[in-house]
């Protein structure tokens, strides 16, 4: 298992609010919690930034972290990430903040310590562009959206 440096920015993390952990041995994501002093009501269509009370430094440029919505919050309540997916670069060292968007029909209240997003670590390949005049021919060519049909 890869070690990632984490800094606790809010003393409640690790005491009142558990540190992120994998729920099962097969879990891909670590749940991130709302490190709030008071509940925050999010009206339909509203967004807000929610602190996690944590900072990470991945340090390894071959890794990045991605913040993703929790499936139950999105499906049952319309609560997703305001930026859809959050990307954490390996050299970022600031607090993890979660952009939360209520795309649902009803107001939703985020409680202090509530699990509101999940974070996964992914491999990164930094590419270098090779300028060419033309590409080698492929079966697909320039076929874009919907080119292969629906069935």
Curated annotation (Swiss-Prot):
Q: Which PANTHER family match?
A: DEOXYURIDINE 5'-TRIPHOSPHATE NUCLEOTIDOHYDROLASE
Q: Would you identify the family this protein belongs to, as annotated?
A: Belongs to the dUTPase family.
Q: In which pathway does it act?
A: Pyrimidine metabolism; dUMP biosynthesis; dUMP from dCTP (dUTP route): step 2/2
> What this chain does, per the record?
This enzyme is involved in nucleotide metabolism: it produces dUMP, the immediate precursor of thymidine nucleotides and it decreases the intracellular concentration of dUTP so that uracil cannot be incorporated into DNA.
Q: How does it assemble?
A: Homotrimer.
What is the designated name of this protein?
Deoxyuridine 5'-triphosphate nucleotidohydrolase
Do you know which NCBIfam families this protein is assigned to? dut (TIGR00576), PRK00601.1 (NF001862)
